[in-house]
């Protein structure tokens, strides 16, 4: 059944991600045939496996995202059609047996549109191994909840969950579980050095590389920028799968270090113990610019976050014919699917950090009064020329704010943290003190009320406030940001696997982040055949296994 989007009046189809990814991969395969694939295979990568064919990549991407519709085994084709907006009083079981049974004209039309994009998967991929859940349900809600806590290494919470049940002592399954939790807890080790924890980050994921890398849809300069700074969904899925297979476990910034109140009332930053089984390695993850900027519209990226009918965060993506589909098309939603299947990838429920500016709104909603409200009471002449160029009145701005606020609350409920990226995506180091103050005030005014504030600032462009030695006591920008409540500061530096600093006065936490994007992966790929390139990712994965052949090369 079709729905109408109040703002866009476009058709919305609830679907699994396989549909849009299969569409994209089919188009990408056709586009890649136009390039000199044979030459790149021989001269650039030095190995055949990465180009084993778009076929495997098509299938892998199509089957790994959003497949958890129910516990019942379905064929790939059934999975594709089963999550279309349900029709009232329609039998789900009948749909699983016959995807077209009982569907009205609107649904049938929607299915035809989906089929027209070539979504049906090859028969050989009816039993996909990727994102196959490692968590086994017992059928007991309490026990399943406790087991999920235990899988995330939070044995105390698992024990509390069981012991909260009246009469648990007489339940053999519960008492056995408690014994197992105690045993597994005793086997944990404290991570030996929090200073060695790496921090990786991404920008908005590319859903459709053919569109993203099409100069006719943007510009040559923009395509180059996308190719350098962005990561495709194919690459992201392979990265997290590889890291999971190698024993990496996601921790939050607040798991690494925390502000501790002293007896005299002062607070100092201290490393926080992390307890994991032997063979596990903690890492931090963040994603920059989760705003779905207007300039990216129609260029192969998700449009925005929305909450589905169950209150779950999902993405919207617009097809070429204007049909809007929903699914997991970006870091947060894909990672949620992955953690649902692999709870042991998350340390005590930890998630990543979502990093937002404010000038263009957040999460795909145009929430900035400064840019989008004719009646903005605090507009001044600063940036007047740029404002005139971008400015239009968003008649739905209050509804957009409310929606963004709900999204932020849902993110935090899942365990995600939200960080400032500055309001205007400014160069924090080279900007004047006055500019930094004005920008910080704007983020506090326009974004903080929507996301609930934050103590994390992740600098735009990777630029920092000061040199590696530390923030000087008289650094007025740092003092102003500290006054605003920021305790965690992150830049970009991929020159080493990890870099962390706690201030000389124990008043801040500072960490370098590593960009896992086209630039870094291309450097890593080329390093195998050209010594002038440096491989900065070898501790995480072999970039030749990750690099998406849909990318234009060289990436530079």
Where are these regions (language model features)?
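Acidic surface patches and DE-rich sequence motifs
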Residues: 15, 262, 308
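C-terminal active-site subregion of NodB/CE4 polysaccharide deacetylases
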Residues: 139, 150, 156-163, 167-171, ...
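Metal-dependent polysaccharide deacetylase catalytic core of the NodB/CE4 family, i.e.
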Residues: 195-212, 265, 269, 276-283, ...
């Amino acid at each position: 059944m079709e729905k109408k989007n109040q703002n866009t009046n476009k058709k919305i189809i609830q679907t699994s991600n396989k549909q849009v990814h299969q569409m994209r991969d089919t188009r990408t395969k056709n586009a890649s045939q136009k390039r000199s694939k044979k030459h790149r295979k021989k001269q650039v990568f030095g190995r055949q496996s990465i180009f084993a064919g778009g076929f495997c990549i098509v299938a892998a991407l199509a089957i790994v995202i959003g497949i958890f519709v129910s516990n019942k085994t379905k064929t790939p084709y059934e999975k594709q059609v089963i999550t279309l907006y349900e029709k009232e009083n329609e039998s789900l079981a009948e749909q699983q047996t016959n995807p077209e049974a009982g569907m009205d004209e609107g649904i049938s039309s929607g299915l035809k549109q989906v089929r027209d994009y070539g979504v049906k998967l090859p028969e050989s991929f009816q039993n996909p191994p990727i994102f196959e859940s490692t968590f086994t349900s017992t059928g007991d809600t309490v026990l399943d909840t406790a087991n999920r806590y235990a899988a995330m290494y939070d044995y105390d919470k698992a024990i509390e969950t069981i012991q909260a049940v009246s009469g648990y002592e007489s339940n053999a399954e519960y008492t056995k579980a408690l014994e197992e939790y105690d045993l597994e807890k005793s086997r944990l080790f404290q991570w030996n050095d929090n200073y060695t924890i790496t921090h990786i980050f991404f920008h908005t994921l590319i859903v459709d590389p053919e569109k993203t890398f099409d100069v006719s849809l943007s510009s040559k300069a923009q395509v180059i920028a996308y190719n350098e700074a962005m990561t495709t969904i194919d690459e992201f899925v392979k990265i997290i799968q590889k890291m999971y297979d190698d024993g990496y476990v996601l921790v939050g910034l607040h798991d690494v270090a925390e502000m501790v109140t002293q007896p005299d009332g002062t607070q100092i930053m201290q490393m926080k113990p992390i307890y994991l089984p032997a063979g596990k390695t903690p890492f931090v993850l963040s994603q920059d610019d989760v705003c779905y900027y207007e300039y990216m519209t129609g260029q192969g990226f998700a449009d925005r976050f929305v909450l589905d009918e169950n209150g779950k965060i999902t993405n919207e993506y617009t097809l070429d014919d204007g049909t809007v589909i929903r699914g997991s098309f970006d870091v947060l939603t894909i990672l949620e699917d992955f953690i649902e299947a692999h709870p042991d990838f998350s340390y005590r429920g930890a998630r990543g950090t979502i990093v937002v500016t404010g000038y263009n709104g957040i999460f795909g909603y145009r929430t900035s009064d400064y840019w989008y409200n004719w009646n903005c009471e605090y507009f001044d002449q600063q940036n007047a020329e740029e404002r005139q160029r971008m400015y239009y009145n968003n008649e739905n701005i209050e509804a957009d704010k409310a929606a963004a606020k709900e999204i932020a609350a849902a993110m935090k409920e899942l365990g995600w943290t939200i960080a400032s990226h500055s309001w205007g995506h400014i160069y924090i180091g080279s900007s004047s003190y006055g500019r930094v103050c004005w920008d910080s005030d704007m983020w506090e005014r326009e974004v903080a009320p929507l996301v609930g504030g934050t103590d994390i600032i992740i600098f735009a462009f990777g630029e920092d406030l000061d040199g590696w030695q530390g923030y000087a006591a008289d650094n007025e920008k740092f003092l102003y940001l500290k006054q605003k409540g920021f305790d965690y500061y992150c830049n970009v530096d991929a020159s080493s696997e990890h870099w962390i600093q706690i201030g000389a006065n124990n008043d801040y936490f500072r960490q370098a982040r590593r960009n896992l994007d086209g630039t870094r992966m291309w450097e890593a790929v080329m390093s195998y055949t050209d010594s002038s390139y440096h491989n900065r990712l070898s501790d995480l994965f072999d970039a030749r296994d990750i690099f998406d052949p849909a990318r234009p090369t060289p990436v530079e």
